[in-house]
Amino acid sequence: MSHPHDTGIQDLEAPVVLVVPADPSFVRLARLVVSSLAADLAFDFDEIEDLRIAADELVSAAIGAAEPFSPVRIQLTTGQGVLSLEASAATSTLGAELDPLAAQIVEALVASHDVSTAGGFITVKFRSHTPGSSQHLA
């Protein structure tokens, strides 16, 4: 039986890129894009919610550390059985990190995540194994 949202997408031919202002009201747009892509990749409902929450926490961290009015670039890619999110923005914050509770939440929801600041930018990332990959739900 096929997944109700299965569109046959296995790997994206090109990244999905979203650029939003450093304004917390745009976090919901990132969540929507992540949820939609995860559904197209045949993640189940609970996994989609996990990815949505992880995206919320990480994109919120990037927006929170970003310079006012600067763009936040969010890129989603797939390949080799992995869905990846990376968000980056200009920042003057050194050593940015997730709130400890947010870090625990994200750690429980995705295969790996990272928050770093270098060269005047904050970058947040997560990776999650896609349905059908050998590591999915491992």
Predicted regions and their residues:
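Bergerat-fold GHKL ATPase/HATPase_c domain
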Residues: 1-53
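Conserved beta-strand-loop-beta-strand hairpin that lines the nucleotide-binding pocket
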Residues: 1-17, 61-138
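Conserved ATP-binding N-box helix of the HATPase_c
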Residues: 45-69
